[in-house]
Amino acid sequence: MASIILINFSETDTLHLGSVNDHIMPRIGYTILSIIMALSSTFGIILNMVVIIVTVRYKQLRQPLNYALVNLAVADLGCPVFGGLLTAVTNAMGYFSLGRVGCVLEGFAVAFFGIAGLCSVAVIAVDRYMVVCRPLGAVMFQTKHALAGVVFSWVWSFIWNTPPLFGWGSYQLEGVMTSCAPNWYRRDPVNVSYILCYFMLCFALPFATIIFSYMHLLHTLWQVAKLQVADSGSTAKVEVQVARMVVIMVMAFLLTWLPYAAFALTVIIDSNIYINPVIGTIPAYLAKSSTVFNPIIYIFMNRQFRDYALPCLLCGKNPWAAKEGRDSDTNTLTTTVSKNTSVSPL
């Protein structure tokens, strides 16, 4: 039978060595997953490295409001380096070959970088809310505020991903049993209490923060857009461009993470649910693919990052370079605009 009860994963599953799990999925399925993860990890590493390198290299990008973006790129780099590449290898082998310790370390690393990335998106949303929606936000937002957001994302992720290392919760194989994650399936009170706290504070809270911040941001941008005629259109144009980029960035992140969060919540609520392990693997792989989308959005929707990153990727060429007004537009994006709201590069 193709379906299994997810809660039946045991500690010995993570020690299973030397044979392909073809009772879960045919060998060709593992090969396909290995190729997908190898490609996703490679692109994720390259693109996030470009974001980090161009930010470090060019002073124009080293602004407080860009710190959270670079922090997200670091988190998105950690996921494929410490998780994606390993998953590609284990899928190529058809079973998890790293033993119990390897499972714990891989599960911790992916969860640590993944939640740090999710918190970084929440921090980005709060940053934008402060600058766009709050009076004098750009004046008040300083380096110390940006650094506080960066530190918070890592500390928060560390706090909530280390308890399984000490007995409150655990890391266990998931899906087709070639990668590890927090153990959503064990039903004892200690593990359930951890998973509920983890879900509320590492998924629900960042999601709520993102939604609250961007709903207010979009409302403010809509109000500013109505002043386009009176304000020659320049401010409203920049505001709309910024809104489009941040909304697409957040939606891409949520669309990749929400299925995983919903899957985990379903398992927590209904302990007897039957789910095909292949279907159970899809949300996890969607979540891991988010590390590719964010740098693409930075490069192709943010003129500042695009002007510096594309030449780095394309050997000095930038086919999207603006023919006219490049300097004036860049200067507009690197300074605050209008009396009502302020925008910085995203």
UniProtKB/Swiss-Prot annotation:
Record has GTP-binding as a keyword: no
UniProt entry keywords in alphabetical sequence: Chromophore, Disulfide bond, G-protein coupled receptor, Glycoprotein, Lipoprotein, Membrane, Palmitate, Phosphoprotein, Photoreceptor protein, Receptor, Retinal protein, Sensory transduction, Transducer, Transmembrane, Transmembrane helix
Disulfide partners: C103-C180
Post-translational modification: Phosphorylated on some or all of the serine and threonine residues present in the C-terminal region.
Stretches assigned to the Cytoplasmic side: 55-66, 127-145, 222-244, 302-346
Lipid sites, type S-palmitoyl cysteine: C315
Single GO molecular function: photoreceptor activity
Membrane topology qualifier: Multi-pass membrane protein
Example GO BP: visual perception
GO annotations of cellular component type: membrane
Protein name, as recorded: Parapinopsin
Organism, as annotated: Ictalurus punctatus
Species classification: Eukaryota, Metazoa, Chordata, Craniata, Vertebrata
